[in-house]
Amino acid sequence: MIMSYERFVLTVVVVLGAIDLTLIAAKGVRVDWAGYAMIGLIGLGTIMLGLFYRLVRQDARISETLILTAGFILFTLVGSVFNYMLLPVHFPRIDDFLVSVDKLMGYHWPSLVLFFSERPSFSALLKIVYFTSLPQLVIVVLLLGFTGQSRKLAHFHITGMMAALLSITIWAFLPTFGTSVVWNIPDDIANKAGLAVDQSYATELIRLSLEGVDYLSPANVLGLIGFPSFHTVMAAMSVFFTWHIVWLRLLVLALNILMVPALLLHGGHHLSDFLGGLVVFAVACLAASYAVSALRDDRAASALAERARALP
């Protein structure tokens, strides 16, 4: 009923969810249970719909797409809670160090902001590009799922999960919140550039890093991780998993080339964050490939065993 790679995804969700509940209870954090329950029910409902298509409609493409997507939705939910449960940070922030590393590479974020404040139309275009990350992933899921590329679909989802867990782990020991907590850009320049991440965002990140969280709600979740950049991971996933689609790959590549200045400018990322995101993607993608191969072998072995038991 549930394939091995689907079971893997859902097991990770359950384990991480149990850790979340333990940490919430231990820290006494108040929670918007209704808000999280709504998203959780959407995920569970999608799984049930996937099982309906598998068992009743006998449609493997739709069922795999729905179940794996539901697993990823639920993982995003429990993963964001886990990230917040690591607050306040327990190690020194390394943003100043990354600024010095960026300087060695010739990168200076305030100069980038100033450059685009003088070109507001281009900055507005990059802002649109910046917010295409999630829609791009949705399109990739639909393309892979509904064209029957189940191995690539599983590889895609497990890559995202592994990259997220690796990013959270790195951030827990090397916390960063991006350039906006280091540089105070004058309001007139920031307004001209139309930054997606403003000074109030940076102020809230600093507060959370010092005080932690006392109330969790999906309505006010912030992106906590600066290094490595998960926006970079998502961009790399979009390019990698559509590269075999000849008519689409150059469009996706062009869009995500623009994503680089977009995430630096509007995501308030260090250049080091971007490079770190590429490394995390490469490691997660390779590890996920091995995991999918192992899980596929397990699925094949299970199928053979079922056939053997069915023989007279």
Where are these regions (language model features)?
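N-terminal transmembrane-helix/juxtamembrane module of multi-pass inner/ER membrane proteins
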Residues: I2-L41, I67-I139
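Interfacial segments of alpha-helical transmembrane regions
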Residues: E64-F72, V138-P175, T179-A190
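Membrane-interface loop-to-helix entry segments
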Residues: F122-Q136, L222-F241, L271, L275
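Membrane-interfacial catalytic/cofactor-binding modules of polytopic membrane enzymes
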Residues: F173-H244
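Interfacial helix-loop-helix junctions of multi-pass membrane proteins
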Residues: G178-V181, G226, I257-V283
